[in-house]
């Protein structure tokens, strides 16, 4: 999982 949530 990435540090930033791109699934927003």
UniProtKB/Swiss-Prot annotation:
Keywords: ATP-binding, Cytoplasm, Cytoskeleton, Nucleotide-binding
One term under GO cellular component: cytoskeleton
One term of GO molecular function: ATP binding
Subcellular location: Cytoplasm, Cytoskeleton
Family of the protein in this entry: Belongs to the actin family.
Function: Actins are highly conserved proteins that are involved in various types of cell motility and are ubiquitously expressed in all eukaryotic cells.
Other remarks in the entry: On the 2D-gel the determined pI of this protein is: 6.8, its MW is: 46 kDa.
Protein name (database record): Actin
């Amino acid at each position: 999982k990435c540090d930033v949530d791109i699934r927003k």
